[in-house]
């Protein structure tokens, strides 16, 4: 078993397990189940699966050029001859039936051998591309899932802001009625309440859109989703050095692996094109049988009939040496060489892209964790500020706008904190994808951070 074949078999096993598990739940209750549902229903992944199945046929197609071909031909004819000459007429009528079997076995066809090796590489390339599609599915599901959770948290924060602004509006109105505040305070509170209501409506609409985006991937309307458990800590990348991740990405990134295989295929194509100048040798064998039945009559009372049978077989070698093909073979060789150079440049570009992706994802994780820590402190500070401003307003040392600003600041801090957490979680997956190691185990690890729906 070759390394490519082994990898294909492992991918087929992974695909079978994913499909088997996808039918076990009717709802996308958590991240892991969402991924499994998407593996069965997502249109892009289904297209990638079909392409993977098609790519697996490259190997038997290439092998066919090394195997013998066997053909059978047959014919039947009716003969009718009427010969007129001086003194007599000759009439001959009858059937001739024949068949032949031809066998051809390539002995030396270098183009066919190279094509077979290309088939092995193309099968491996199909497996890598399918793995890319699977990693892309994980990222799309995770992004859509956490987009929903982020939209839910944003809606909750804005709902709380709208309620708080409404309470502050009522307080401003009652204070105005007793003459402790001016009408300006009422108008400010009314403006903040209206703005909070508008933001809440927009957040609800955004949540609906995010739900539909997730439903598009998982193939069904998601029910209640498991949210991130409170107090969950985010782990730093392991290894915790950007250089290690960059090194892994430059060798293990699936885009790099795909381009490496594409380069090998292009190199084989150069070899196959140049092989057009080489001779070919085939073993050929045939067997033929024919049988004729005819009746002959002349200008005499009697007529004669007869049967003729023939059998024959041949076996030998056939050499074909191309001498001149109009320059087509040389042109195809130059074309293949240019495409090989293109594949080499594509590989270099893939390595650079993997390098950048690893750096961006690593910084996304590390800077995201720093942002989460800072925003957690900001949330606590904003909450303390709100309580202090409320107390100051009650005793007359703070004005209405101070309380409104503190409420808005707390809502903003909570929304930014939620987004930073979810962005960091997705960045962790993107870092694994950049290194080429992202798999269902990573989805399960993130899923363990979630509570129950």
Describe the function of each predicted region.
Residues 176-180, 393-397, 434:
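A short glycine-centered flexible hinge/capping loop motif at secondary-structure junctions
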Residues 27-147, 151, 165, 183, ...:
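Short flexible linkers and secondary-structure junctions
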Residues 2-3, 136-250, 262, 364, ...:
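Periplasmic alpha-helical coiled-coil/stalk elements that build and connect Gram-negative outer-membrane
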Residues 80, 361, 414-453:
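Acidic, low-complexity, intrinsically disordered peripheral segments
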Residues 26-73, 81, 89, 105, ...:
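Bacterial Sec-pathway N-terminal export signals of envelope proteins
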Residues 73-105, 228-239, 267, 271, ...:
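Small/polar, glycine/serine/threonine/aspartate-rich low-complexity segments that form flexible
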Residues 21-23:
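N-terminal signal peptide c-region/cleavage motif recognized by signal peptidases
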Residues 46-50, 60-64, 107-134, 188, ...:
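Sec/SRP-type N-terminal targeting helices
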């Amino acid at each position: 078993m070759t390394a490519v074949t082994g990898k294909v078999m492992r991918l087929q096993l992974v695909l079978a397990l994913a499909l088997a598990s996808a039918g076990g739940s009717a709802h996308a209750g958590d991240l892991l189940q969402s991924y499994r549902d998407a593996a069965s229903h997502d249109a892009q992944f289904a297209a990638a699966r079909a392409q993977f199945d098609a790519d697996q046929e490259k190997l038997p197609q290439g092998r066919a050029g090394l195997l013998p071909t066997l053909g059978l031909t047959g014919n039947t004819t009716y003969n009718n001859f009427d010969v007129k000459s001086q003194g007599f007429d000759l009439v001959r009528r009858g059937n001739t039936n024949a068949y032949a079997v031809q066998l051809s076995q390539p002995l030396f066809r270098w183009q066919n051998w190279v094509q077979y090796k290309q088939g092995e590489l193309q099968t491996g390339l199909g497996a890598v591309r399918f793995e890319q599609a699977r990693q892309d599915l994980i990222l799309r599901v995770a992004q859509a899932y956490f987009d929903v959770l982020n939209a839910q948290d944003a809606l909750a924060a804005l709902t709380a802001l709208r309620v708080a602004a409404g309470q502050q509006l009522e307080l401003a109105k009652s204070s105005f009625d007793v003459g402790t505040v001016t009408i300006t305070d009422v108008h400010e509170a009314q403006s903040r309440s209206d703005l909070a209501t508008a933001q809440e409506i927009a957040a609800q609409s955004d949540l609906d859109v995010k739900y539909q985006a997730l439903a598009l991937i998982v193939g069904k309307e998601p029910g209640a989703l498991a949210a991130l458990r409170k107090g969950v800590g985010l782990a730093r990348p392991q290894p915790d050095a950007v250089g290690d991740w960059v090194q892994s990405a430059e060798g293990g990134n699936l885009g790099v692996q795909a381009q490496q295989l594409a380069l090998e295929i292009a190199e084989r194509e150069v070899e196959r094109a140049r092989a057009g100048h080489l001779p070919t040798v085939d073993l050929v064998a045939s067997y033929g049988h024919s049988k004729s039945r005819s009746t002959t009559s002349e200008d005499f009372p009697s007529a004669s009939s007869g049967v003729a049978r023939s059998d024959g077989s041949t076996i030998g070698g056939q050499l074909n040496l191309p001498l001149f093909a109009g320059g087509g073979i040389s042109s195809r060789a130059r074309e293949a060489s240019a495409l090989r150079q293109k594949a080499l440049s594509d590989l270099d570009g893939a390595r650079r892209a993997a390098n950048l992706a690893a750096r961006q994802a690593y910084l996304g994780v590390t800077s995201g964790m720093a942002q989460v820590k800072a925003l957690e402190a900001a949330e606590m500070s904003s909450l303390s500020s709100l309580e202090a401003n409320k107390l100051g307003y009650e005793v007359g040392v703070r004005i209405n706008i101070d309380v409104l600003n503190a409420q808005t600041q707390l809502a903003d801090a909570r929304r930014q904190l939620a987004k930073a957490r979810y962005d960091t979680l997705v960045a962790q997956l993107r870092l694994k994808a950049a290194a080429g190691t992202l798999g269902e185990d990573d989805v399960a690890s993130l899923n363990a951070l979630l509570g129950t729906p």
